[in-house]
Amino acid sequence: MFLIHASFLVILLGALLSWTTAQSGTIHLRLGEATNVMKTTEGNSVDLGFKVALKTFRMDCYPGTDAAMDYVTEITTSDELLEISMNKIGYYHGFRFMQSGYDSDMQGSILGVYHDPWGIAVTYLGYAMLLISLIAILLGKGTRMRQLYRKATAGNALKVAAVAVVMALSPLFSLNSQAQERININSHVADGFGRVCVLYNSRITPINTVAVDFVTKLCGKPSWDGLSATEVFCGWVFDVPYWETVKMIEIKDKKAQELLGLNDKWASFNDFWDEYNEYKLEKPLKEAMRKGDTKMQKSLRDADEKFNIVRMLYGGEMLKLFPYRQADGKYKWFAPGQSLGNINLDEKELTFVRKSMDYLAESIITGDNSRASEIVKKIYSYQHVKAKDVIPSKFLIYAEVFYNRLNTLRLPTMLYLSLSLLLGVASTIALNQKKRKIASKVTLWLTVIMFLHTSLLLLLRWMVSGHLPMSNGFETMQFMAWATLLLTLFMGKRFMPVKNFGPLLSSFALLVAMITDGNPQITQLMPVLQSPLLSVHVMVIMFSYALFGLMALIAAEGIWAHRRGDLAKEDQLAATSGFLLYPAVSLLAVGIFIGAVWANVSWGRYWSWDSKETWALITMLIYSAPLHSDLKWLHKPLHIHIYMLLAFLCVLMTYFGVNYFLAGLHSYA
């Protein structure tokens, strides 16, 4: 324990040295110009002692798109050429140069400058000491952690408390009979069209992904009236008059329903227009903005967004099908009907780009499915010939389509949650060992199925996006569900509470992912997030959160055991929590300093007292308290259970409170 406390003192000393001796500021360089002065954060000018000049600045984009992948600055000194980009710092004479911004004309670059001769080295020494001490505690013999392990695994298997949850019934809704007959779009034609690629949200993706986003945005689920998302999307593209009459647009706000003249929450696109062919919400929105009526703006925002999503489809924003390689090697994508300008195409190719979608629409409307399939194949082949270096492979296209079909969390999440609750009840009321064993086996199989399911989802999302799926709230909660299941499989045999609570906690994590973020679009990573250190940082932190969540559920079971007078069980559960506390705190500490190293590499500072950093530190300190042997009152079973339950509020604040309510550098998460 001495080394742990010493490491924190060294880390604090490093922070003090950084605060007292470090200098920070910015330099603004224009192409070909040199400077030896940086502007500090206080507005003062500081002589660097050497001159730097901007040689080049460029923005690298993801292949085939205009989405920024990296910003690269090359500067020259008297004797060196430095290349600086996101996650790549330039070093010269003790100064660190970080990419901070650029001029709109791409002829200038703004660099952050940081000079910290002592603080970083001392802080890193503290991190190393902390890591060594944590390893010693986790692997050492005769430690309190070992004693708690023996106590937690002694005796009979532990049961799980029953948890009462009221589940709301999903609303049933019906379709109004439509006066106009729908064109029957062949499912094979729709599926083939769904595998054609488009440029969408600065990413090259199959139309199936656009269709899922489009339909989910309109009606809240990726299907409608027994039709797949791609079939519905094809209807909106090729059978516009009918689909404009379908009441599939969900309007939740009562004020918006009133202005649109609705009797319930379902609207058609035609409901947005009055008898004079004017948009019904245009005047109320303008009036609300003029008066600063934020309440009215909020009421109408969702309905207005859904209206404009359909308008975006009509404007071609969702159907940029045809790639054209420009002279600079970059690609421009054209939608059907869009002006092609002076692009260099022969007459036959130009006709194909302009007319192929018209021919496809004609074939679908007349029911000529073989011709429609042939045209879809030609568009698909055209893309793979004209943009073969940027179009996803056939395997990745099929993988993304499969992911879109598989990634419907509502039904499996509710099923997993219901089963895990029922198994908890069964484990609690089982009166004999045989029934408990049956419940235990079913719990194990449920855990395995959930683990394989979440593993497949994460793997497919990783393959499709090209980066580890831990860049937003939805992905991190999915990863936490997976991490919980992995811990359950790894530790469940020794710790029955972990085995019984694992599927339940994982189900709640999936439920939170479903409720808070729904299913966000897969997007390209912003440049600063393209670091392996970030992936490791998030991964380690989420494993620690999974352990803290398990400990909170175990604490609730321990309090329940105390109320029933089962002191032996209460004591054993306290030992289980105490044992899990060691790896949980260790993972959190390691995750925090990996994040600090990433921040130091990315923008030159390892700590900025951002709200996420501050709350992560508070969480670590609060969970570290029970590890101190001097705090005898925290070693009493009931006290430790109450403490663990309350401490989990810090985890909730660190994750949800900071991500969704507080502003800071971690807002992108």
Regions found by a protein language model. Give the residues of each.
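Solvent-exposed, non-transmembrane regions of integral membrane proteins
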Residues: 1-669
